Regions:
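Structural recognition of short helix-loop-helix hairpins that underlie histone-fold modules
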Residues: 68-69
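Conserved catalytic-core segments centered on acid/base and nucleophilic motifs
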Residues: 10-14, 144-147
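Mature-region segments of soluble proteins
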Residues: 2-3, 44-45, 55-62, 73-237
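C-terminal segment of N-terminal export signals and the immediately downstream linker at the start
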Residues: 3-10, 25-65
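Sec-dependent signal peptide hydrophobic core
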Residues: 15-20
Length: 237
């Protein structure tokens, strides 16, 4: 994000430090095969959406492009495929809550106890998008994706700080941290999951990829800058 909230440097600092996200990881199960995806819900998403509807896709695209704007470090979020990564995560096992205990009892917990809601991640995302758009319509008479950048920033900072209250009691901060987490994971996950297109996230931080053995490079690059073309799972398959 830009200006008043989290700039790119602070955004990445929080990422590499582990962040403050108290939800489950979105990557861990097999990625959804491309041929199983539905007809694209929006023209800007080439591979098509499996979970997000038109309104939700517009929201997610606006969020990832605001959090990850195009600059000298990387392309914008949609060009990195972060919206596709999020859609696949929501459509897959993580979004369905496959690895979550979903039988209650449901009580308000502490942040160090992890995710405590009776909603599957996909349900949280869907409800959070609808609630955020409802707030934006009430406050600005527009949906989130229609807002200028400064107002998008106000909304995201409000969600992050828990200063926006959703009707029905859905915790805005939990929605934000879940959304923030999936943006981070989309930036730095293996491209096979839909995000980090062209390994742009890895190139930005100098990550070499999935190479498991570096012993042969210890002497070769001693006291030298280690510059290498990053390798993904697909490169080694």
């Amino acid at each position: 994000m830009k200006d008043d909230g989290i700039n790119r440097r602070e955004f990445l600092k929080g990422t590499l430090a582990g962040g403050a996200v108290a939800t489950t990881a979105a990557v861990g199960l097999a990625p959804q095969p491309a041929q199983a995806q539905q007809k694209p819900a929006a023209a800007s998403a080439n591979p098509g959406y499996s979970f997000l509807n038109l309104e939700e896709a517009a929201f997610v695209e606006a969020v990832v492009d605001h959090m990850v704007p195009a600059d000298e470090h990387s392309p914008k979020g949609t060009d990195m495929g972060l919206n596709i990564f999020i859609d696949r995560a929501l459509a897959g096992g993580w979004g369905k809550g496959d690895r979550l205990y979903m039988q209650g009892p449901w009580k308000v917990g502490h942040p160090n106890q992890g995710y405590q809601l009776p909603l599957k991640p996909s349900e949280l995302y869907r409800a959070g998008i609808a609630a955020t758009n409802a707030y934006c319509k009430k406050t600005y008479s527009k949906t989130f994706d229609q807002l200028p950048e400064a107002q998008k920033q106000e909304v995201l900072v409000g969600l992050q700080g828990g200063k926006i209250n959703f009707e029905g009691g859905l915790p805005a901060r939990t929605f934000f941290t879940t959304m923030y987490q999936t943006v981070i994971e989309g930036m730095f996950s293996d491209p096979i999951y839909g995000g980090n297109r062209n390994k742009a996230g890895w190139r930005m931080i100098g990550f070499p990829g999935v190479v498991a053995v570096h012993a042969q490079n210890i002497d070769k690059f001693r006291d030298k800058k280690y510059t290498v073309e990053p390798l993904s799972i697909a490169d080694l398959s």
